[in-house]
A protein has these predicted regions:
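Active-site loop segments of alpha/beta catalytic cores
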Residues: 1-27, 35, 106-200
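Short C-terminal domain-edge/linker segments immediately following a structured domain
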Residues: 48-54, 92-97, 161-166, 185, ...
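Aromatic- and acidic-residue-enriched segments that line the glycan-binding/catalytic groove
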Residues: 38-39, 73-87, 140-154
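A gly/proline- and charged-residue-enriched helix-loop-helix capping module
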Residues: 83-121
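An N-terminal domain-start capping segment
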Residues: 31-49, 91-102, 138-143
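Low-complexity, flexible helical/coil segments
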Residues: 54-59, 96-106, 166-173
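Glycine-rich loops and low-complexity Gly/Arg-rich segments
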Residues: 42-47, 85-90, 156-160
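N-terminal basic, low-complexity leaders that serve as flexible interaction/assembly modules and, when applicable
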Residues: 1-83
C-alpha cells in the first residue's frame, strides 16, 4: 500500500473514520483468552487485531500497545497478568555508570521477535486497511528503564544519564521500527505517554 497516496486520499474524504487503539479490548471477543496468553503469542495477537478489524470500521489496524515489550528487550523485568497488560518492575538504570553500561539489544530480544512476527501475520489477515505497528516512544521507554517517576527527577539531577539512555533507546527503536516495516507494517505508531507528565 502506498501510504503517501493513502494520506492524500484521506484529506479529500468528506467523512473521517476513527483510528482507535483497540488491541487489548479485542480480547473480550476471543473466548476466555487471557492477556498473559495474548502478549506471548504472535498468532493470537494477529487474530486479535483481525477480530477488532472485523468488528470496527476503523481507518487502520494497530498492533498491541504493550509498553513493557521494548524495555524487556533491554533487560528490564516484566510482570505478567491474566487481566491487564504487562508492567515493568523496578529500574534497570539509576546512575550515569549504568546508563553508560546499558547495551542496545538486537531486534528479537525478549518478546520483540514475536511482536514483529505478529505484524507479519496480521498483514496477511487484514487486507482492507493499513496495518500499523504500535511502538513505545523514546522518552517513555527511557522512563520504563529508569523508573517512570524517577526519570522526572533524574532529568534535573543527572541529565547526562537521561541523554545517554535516550540516545541508546532511540537507536534501538529506529531499528525495531524498520523491522516492523520489513515485516509488512504500513506505518509505525509511536506512543510516548510520559511526554505529558511533569513534576512541580
Amino acid at each position: 500500500m502506498n501510504m503517501y497516496s493513502w494520506l492524500e486520499e484521506l484529506k479529500t474524504q468528506p467523512s473521517k473514520k476513527p483510528f482507535p487503539i483497540l488491541s487489548f479490548p479485542g480480547i473480550q471477543h476471543m473466548d476466555g483468552l487471557t492477556v498473559r496468553e495474548l502478549v506471548c503469542s504472535a498468532e493470537l495477537q494477529a487474530q486479535c487485531m483481525k477480530k477488532v478489524a472485523d468488528l470496527t470500521d476503523s481507518l487502520a489496524s494497530v498492533s498491541l500497545m504493550d509498553l513493557s515489550l521494548e524495555a524487556e528487550a533491554f533487560g528490564a523485568e516484566a510482570m505478567f497478568f491474566d487481566d491487564e497488560p504487562p508492567a515493568i518492575q523496578g529500574a534497570l538504570v539509576t546512575t550515569q555508570e549504568e546508563a553508560d553500561a546499558l547495551q542496545i539489544p538486537q531486534v528479537g530480544a525478549g518478546r520483540t521477535g514475536m511482536a514483529v512476527e505478529g505484524i507479519r501475520l496480521a498483514k496477511q489477515l487484514i487486507t482492507d486497511r493499513p496495518v500499523f505497528a504500535g511502538v513505545i516512544g523514546p522518552y517513555s521507554l527511557a522512563g520504563r528503564l529508569m523508573d517512570v517517576t524517577e526519570i522526572m527527577y533524574i532529568c534535573y539531577d543527572e541529565p547526562e544519564a537521561v541523554h545517554e539512555v535516550l540516545d541508546k533507546v532511540t537507536t534501538y527503536l529506529i531499528t525495531y521500527g524498520q523491522a516492523m516495516k520489513d515485516a509488512g507494517a504500513d506505518g509505525v505508531s509511536l506512543i510516548n505517554t510520559l511526554l505529558g507528565m511533569r513534576i512541580d
